[in-house]
Amino acid sequence: MTKQKILVIGTGGTIGAKAGSTITADAPLKILNLYTPPAGVDLIGQAAFDRFSEHADLAYLEQLCTYMQGIDYSAYRGVVLLHGSDTLTYTAALLAHLLPDKPLVLVAAGTPPEAPGSNALSNLDLAVQYLLSGAKDGVQIAYDGLHPAWATTEADCNDRFHHASVPFVPVQPRRSTGAAFCKSRPTRA
Protein backbone atom coordinates (compact mmCIF):
# COMPACT_ATOMS: atom_id res chain seq x y z
CA MET A 1 0.00 0.00 0.00
CA THR A 2 1.31 3.43 -0.93
CA LYS A 3 1.67 5.84 1.96
CA GLN A 4 0.00 9.21 1.82
CA LYS A 5 2.63 11.94 1.89
CA ILE A 6 2.30 15.21 3.77
CA LEU A 7 4.99 17.83 3.35
CA VAL A 8 5.96 19.57 6.62
CA ILE A 9 7.90 22.81 6.21
CA GLY A 10 9.74 24.27 9.17
CA THR A 11 10.18 28.02 9.41
CA GLY A 12 11.15 28.39 13.07
CA GLY A 13 9.12 29.98 15.81
CA THR A 14 8.15 28.59 19.19
CA ILE A 15 7.05 25.32 17.59
CA GLY A 16 10.69 24.77 16.59
CA ALA A 17 12.24 26.21 19.75
CA LYS A 18 13.52 24.62 22.94
CA ALA A 19 12.01 25.12 26.35
CA GLY A 20 13.88 26.72 29.21
CA SER A 21 13.87 29.92 31.22
CA THR A 22 13.66 31.66 27.84
CA ILE A 23 12.51 30.38 24.46
CA THR A 24 15.48 29.94 22.14
CA ALA A 25 15.78 28.66 18.59
CA ASP A 26 16.46 24.96 18.26
CA ALA A 27 15.47 22.95 15.18
CA PRO A 28 12.57 23.90 12.91
CA LEU A 29 11.51 20.25 12.38
CA LYS A 30 12.17 18.70 15.79
CA ILE A 31 8.45 18.19 16.33
CA LEU A 32 8.61 15.42 13.72
CA ASN A 33 10.76 13.41 16.15
CA LEU A 34 8.05 13.77 18.83
CA TYR A 35 4.96 13.13 16.70
CA THR A 36 3.73 9.73 15.56
CA PRO A 37 1.73 10.11 12.36
CA PRO A 38 -1.29 7.93 11.63
CA ALA A 39 -0.64 4.58 9.96
CA GLY A 40 -0.10 4.90 6.24
CA VAL A 41 1.11 8.50 6.44
CA ASP A 42 4.63 9.64 5.64
CA LEU A 43 5.63 13.11 6.84
CA ILE A 44 8.32 14.65 4.62
CA GLY A 45 10.22 17.41 6.43
CA GLN A 46 11.92 20.42 4.87
CA ALA A 47 13.63 23.01 7.08
CA ALA A 48 13.19 25.96 4.75
CA PHE A 49 13.79 28.77 7.25
CA ASP A 50 14.76 29.21 10.89
CA ARG A 51 13.56 32.45 12.45
CA PHE A 52 11.05 33.64 14.97
CA SER A 53 8.02 35.06 13.20
CA GLU A 54 8.28 38.42 14.94
CA HIS A 55 11.46 38.94 12.89
CA ALA A 56 9.63 38.50 9.58
CA ASP A 57 10.18 41.37 7.19
CA LEU A 58 9.19 42.00 3.58
CA ALA A 59 12.26 40.23 2.17
CA TYR A 60 11.51 37.14 4.26
CA LEU A 61 7.83 37.13 3.24
CA GLU A 62 8.84 37.38 -0.42
CA GLN A 63 11.19 34.40 0.04
CA LEU A 64 8.50 32.42 1.83
CA CYS A 65 5.90 33.16 -0.86
CA THR A 66 8.32 32.15 -3.61
CA TYR A 67 9.14 28.96 -1.72
CA MET A 68 5.46 28.10 -1.18
CA GLN A 69 4.61 28.78 -4.84
CA GLY A 70 7.42 26.42 -5.91
CA ILE A 71 5.93 23.38 -4.17
CA ASP A 72 4.42 20.62 -6.32
CA TYR A 73 1.21 20.31 -4.29
CA SER A 74 0.02 17.43 -6.46
CA ALA A 75 2.81 15.26 -5.01
CA TYR A 76 1.35 15.50 -1.48
CA ARG A 77 -1.93 14.95 0.30
CA GLY A 78 -1.29 18.39 1.75
CA VAL A 79 1.28 20.74 3.21
CA VAL A 80 1.86 21.80 6.82
CA LEU A 81 3.75 25.03 7.43
CA LEU A 82 5.22 25.21 10.95
CA HIS A 83 5.22 28.89 11.88
CA GLY A 84 5.63 31.17 14.88
CA SER A 85 2.45 32.39 16.53
CA ASP A 86 3.34 36.09 16.74
CA THR A 87 2.67 36.82 13.06
CA LEU A 88 0.80 33.62 12.21
CA THR A 89 -2.44 35.26 11.11
CA TYR A 90 -0.69 37.78 8.88
CA THR A 91 1.31 35.13 7.03
CA ALA A 92 -1.76 32.87 6.88
CA ALA A 93 -3.90 35.61 5.32
CA LEU A 94 -1.19 36.36 2.78
CA LEU A 95 -0.88 32.68 1.81
CA ALA A 96 -4.67 32.28 1.72
CA HIS A 97 -4.83 34.93 -0.99
CA LEU A 98 -1.74 33.66 -2.81
CA LEU A 99 -2.65 29.94 -2.71
CA PRO A 100 -6.44 29.84 -2.19
CA ASP A 101 -7.00 26.37 -3.61
CA LYS A 102 -4.01 24.57 -2.09
CA PRO A 103 -4.22 22.03 0.77
CA LEU A 104 -2.20 24.08 3.25
CA VAL A 105 -2.41 24.33 7.04
CA LEU A 106 -0.25 26.66 9.14
CA VAL A 107 0.60 25.25 12.57
CA ALA A 108 1.99 27.09 15.60
CA ALA A 109 2.35 26.48 19.33
CA GLY A 110 2.21 28.50 22.52
CA THR A 111 5.23 26.71 23.99
CA PRO A 112 7.94 24.43 22.52
CA PRO A 113 6.78 20.89 21.71
CA GLU A 114 8.51 19.19 24.65
CA ALA A 115 7.24 21.69 27.24
CA PRO A 116 4.60 20.36 29.65
CA GLY A 117 1.13 21.25 28.42
CA SER A 118 2.32 22.37 24.98
CA ASN A 119 -0.31 22.44 22.26
CA ALA A 120 2.30 21.78 19.55
CA LEU A 121 1.59 18.07 19.03
CA SER A 122 -2.19 18.42 19.16
CA ASN A 123 -2.06 21.31 16.67
CA LEU A 124 0.12 19.28 14.29
CA ASP A 125 -2.20 16.29 14.64
CA LEU A 126 -5.22 18.48 13.89
CA ALA A 127 -3.52 19.70 10.70
CA VAL A 128 -2.61 16.16 9.61
CA GLN A 129 -6.14 14.87 10.26
CA TYR A 130 -7.63 17.80 8.36
CA LEU A 131 -5.41 17.19 5.34
CA LEU A 132 -6.18 13.47 5.39
CA SER A 133 -9.91 14.24 5.42
CA GLY A 134 -9.62 15.75 1.95
CA ALA A 135 -11.49 18.90 2.97
CA LYS A 136 -11.09 21.73 0.50
CA ASP A 137 -11.88 24.80 2.56
CA GLY A 138 -8.81 26.81 1.58
CA VAL A 139 -5.77 27.61 3.69
CA GLN A 140 -6.30 26.91 7.41
CA ILE A 141 -4.65 27.62 10.75
CA ALA A 142 -4.38 24.79 13.30
CA TYR A 143 -4.05 26.33 16.74
CA ASP A 144 -6.34 25.01 19.48
CA GLY A 145 -8.88 24.38 16.73
CA LEU A 146 -9.08 24.87 13.00
CA HIS A 147 -9.48 28.43 11.71
CA PRO A 148 -9.86 29.81 8.16
CA ALA A 149 -6.64 31.65 7.37
CA TRP A 150 -8.31 34.56 5.59
CA ALA A 151 -10.64 35.41 8.48
CA THR A 152 -8.73 34.79 11.68
CA THR A 153 -7.76 37.57 14.05
CA GLU A 154 -4.43 37.97 15.77
CA ALA A 155 -4.16 36.02 19.03
CA ASP A 156 -5.71 37.70 22.02
CA CYS A 157 -3.96 38.26 25.35
CA ASN A 158 -4.59 34.63 26.31
CA ASP A 159 -3.08 33.29 23.08
CA ARG A 160 -6.45 32.39 21.53
CA PHE A 161 -7.25 32.97 17.88
CA HIS A 162 -10.77 33.94 16.78
CA HIS A 163 -12.73 34.14 13.54
CA ALA A 164 -13.25 37.67 12.33
CA SER A 165 -16.97 38.42 12.44
CA VAL A 166 -16.73 40.70 9.41
CA PRO A 167 -13.55 40.02 7.45
CA PHE A 168 -11.67 42.74 5.62
CA VAL A 169 -13.43 45.69 7.23
CA PRO A 170 -10.97 48.52 7.93
CA VAL A 171 -10.63 49.33 11.60
CA GLN A 172 -9.61 52.56 13.28
CA PRO A 173 -6.10 52.59 14.73
CA ARG A 174 -5.95 52.11 18.48
CA ARG A 175 -4.94 55.07 20.58
CA SER A 176 -3.56 52.77 23.24
CA THR A 177 -0.33 50.79 23.09
CA GLY A 178 -2.39 47.72 23.91
CA ALA A 179 -0.66 47.16 27.24
CA ALA A 180 -3.87 47.75 29.20
CA PHE A 181 -5.62 45.07 27.15
CA CYS A 182 -2.99 42.39 27.80
CA LYS A 183 -2.40 42.44 31.54
CA SER A 184 -3.53 38.82 31.89
CA ARG A 185 -1.13 37.42 29.26
CA PRO A 186 0.76 34.48 30.77
CA THR A 187 4.54 34.53 30.59
CA ARG A 188 6.22 31.93 28.43
CA ALA A 189 8.26 29.26 30.11
Q: Which residues does each PLM region occupy?
A:
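Active-site histidine-anchored catalytic micro-motif
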Residues: 2-189
